[in-house]
């Protein structure tokens, strides 16, 4: 069976069609996925999840031209869950990573993500109530053909560069890892963070400064 791989988008859509109607990609859909998947995560884990969620849906739309346009994007464990609303922290996570997707060799990856097992304070694995730890991959330090694909998708798919574990990402963030390092922890050292063009762009420098400040404020608040 041949794979259908669409043309790589240069620009992110402003809106996407979902089972909840038309939503702004950056201001509604991505924040609501972060809320639906891991509402109470550390800010850096939320930022990592926002990038993974954005990549996941845009890659799916790339290869299924009707998805998000005439075919509604679903919400559920078979795709990714989006909540009815989003907290301010989830909105910020989407805002500071606006337009950023994960790529390998110039193509968006699948960017699978699951809950995975909880992690204990000492860094050992805890319980796995969702039975999804089996899909999580640990690819820190790996590149190219050494990156472990996830069994959640076809292993031979060129975009299969592993799977993020949300609880592990939260633990990593609590240890001081930033969202870029968290993403490479699961998807490999050679994963590319690429910014798509957008009519809503506020500028890299301004957004970066706002992002650092916002994440720092939330992080300080969470530690109190």
Range-by-range predicted roles:
Residues 206-223:
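Terminal signal-anchor or tail-anchor transmembrane helices
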């Amino acid at each position: 069976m041949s794979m259908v791989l669409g043309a790589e988008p240069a620009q992110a859509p402003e809106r996407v069609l979902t089972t909840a109607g038309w939503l702004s990609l950056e201001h509604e859909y991505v924040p609501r996925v972060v809320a639906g998947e891991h509402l109470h995560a550390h800010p850096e884990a939320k930022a990592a999840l926002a990038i993974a969620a954005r990549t996941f849906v845009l890659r799916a739309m790339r290869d299924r031209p009707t998805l998000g346009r005439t075919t509604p994007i679903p919400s559920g464990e078979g795709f990714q869950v989006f909540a009815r609303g989003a907290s301010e922290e989830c909105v910020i996570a989407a805002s500071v990573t606006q337009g950023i997707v994960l790529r390998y060799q110039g193509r968006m990856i699948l960017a699978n993500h699951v809950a995975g097992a909880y992690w204990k304070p000492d860094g050992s694995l805890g319980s796995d109530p969702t039975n999804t730890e089996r899909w999580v991959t640990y690819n820190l330090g790996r590149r190219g053909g050494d990156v472990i694909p996830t069994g959640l998708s076809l292993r031979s798919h060129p975009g299969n560069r592993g799977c993020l574990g949300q609880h592990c990402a939260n633990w990593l963030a609590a240890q001081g890892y930033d969202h870029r390092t968290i993403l490479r922890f699961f998807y490999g050292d050679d994963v590319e963070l690429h910014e798509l063009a957008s009519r809503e762009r506020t500028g890299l420098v301004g957004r970066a400064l706002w992002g650092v400040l916002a994440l720092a404020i939330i992080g300080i608040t969470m530690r109190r």
